[in-house]
Amino acid sequence: MSGYTASVVGASGFTGGEVLRLLSGHPEMAVTQATSRSYENKTVGSIHPNLRGMDLRFSSPEELESVDVLFACTPHGVSMEHIDAFQDAADTVVDLSADFRLDIESQYDEWYDGHNRPELLDKAEYALPELNRENLPGADIVASGGCNATAAIMGLKPLFDGDILGGGEQIVVDVKVGSSEGGAGGGEASSHPERSGVVRPYAPTGHRHEAEIEQFLGTGVSFTAHAVDMTRGASATCHVYPEEPVSKGDLWSAFRESYEDEPFVRLVAGGSGVYRYPEPKAVAGSNYAEVGFELDPTNKRVVVFSAIDNMMKGSAGQAVHAANIALGIEETAGLEFAGLHPVGAP
């Protein structure tokens, strides 16, 4: 019997299904409840066909069971509305939405539609374990980082850690994301006939994850997001212009110093073969992030690359990683598996 009990609220969506998949093989956590308003009493496998062997039915979110950890896989606005019920049911709440990622109420006024529980913002711990794992043990509310923000922050973090960037430089972030980012509900733009074959700018400016990136790097960024023809993945290409000259040796040192002890980060910079730089296809289905860089001395530019599976490192995998740390479990538990290769068309 696993040592900790878990419930998944909003379990019929893509992120909820991914959390269920991870917990189904977790050595220390067992799912005792999965909720869905739309599919109450239906088997989990009837909605998530990859989980047909899971002996669990969806229950009502109005009847939450007492558990050690609750994963809230709900749309923006739901967790802040129901956080009291979530906390009554669980010692630790891991929220996969944006409801508790930002620090202050004014940020929600600017980037979202306000916040109705601002008194809880300073009690929630942002979860990108490579950034702040020391804040997670014993946390009551864990706000799992967003997929686009995670991709960008993972790539840029070593440049700040290594004092290559100080905060006043120009930073341009271009992220390309898969269709699963739109969720199971999707929409016209996410349907196969509309999505197939596209490289579509959908947030040239003003993407909400820009606030998340700026908050945790402490500097402004110019952020653009494109929808592309893949199901899973987020690929960030970041263009930065350091004020002082930078060598490849400086970059290698900075990235190794930041990530050499990180269990879910791989440094991929040049080399030979097809996969010479980070690519979402190489991490599909896993909690790994690949990061890399290239130097453009002619234009005094550093190009940084980061690739994640938006459903894993950008969502469910990161949430389970954070929950492991919050509960005092070995942080890699249930996540130490490679991605899928080859991966076919979306």
Curated annotation (Swiss-Prot):
InterPro entries xref list: AGPR_type-1, LysY, NAD(P)-bd_dom_sf, NAGSA_dehydrogenase, Semialdehyde_DH_NAD-bd
Positions of the catalytic residues: 147
Entry keyword Amino-acid biosynthesis: yes
SMART domains: Semialdhyde_dh (SM00859)
Keywords, ordered alphabetically: Amino-acid biosynthesis, Arginine biosynthesis, Cytoplasm, Lysine biosynthesis, NADP, Oxidoreductase
Record localization: Cytoplasm
GO CC terms, sorted: cytoplasm
Principal subcellular localisation of the protein: cytoplasm
Pathway assignment: Amino-acid biosynthesis; L-lysine biosynthesis via AAA pathway; L-lysine from L-alpha-aminoadipate (Thermus route): step 3/5; Amino-acid biosynthesis; L-arginine biosynthesis
Sequence positions that bind NADP(+): 12-15, 310
Catalytic activity: [amino-group carrier protein]-C-terminal-N-(1-carboxy-5-oxopentan-1-yl)-L-glutamine + phosphate + NADP(+) = [amino-group carrier protein]-C-terminal-N-(1-carboxy-5-phosphooxy-5-oxopentan-1-yl)-L-glutamine + NADPH + H(+); [amino-group carrier protein]-C-terminal-gamma-(L-glutamyl-5-semialdehyde)-L-glutamate + phosphate + NADP(+) = [amino-group carrier protein]-C-terminal-gamma-(5-phospho-L-glutamyl)-L-glutamate + NADPH + H(+)
Family recorded in the similarity comment: Belongs to the NAGSA dehydrogenase family. Type 1 subfamily. LysY sub-subfamily.
Function field: Involved in both the arginine and lysine biosynthetic pathways.
Name of this chain's protein: Putative [LysW]-L-2-aminoadipate/[LysW]-L-glutamate phosphate reductase
Source organism of this protein record: Natronomonas pharaonis (strain ATCC 35678 / DSM 2160 / CIP 103997 / JCM 8858 / NBRC 14720 / NCIMB 2260 / Gabara)
Gene designation: lysY
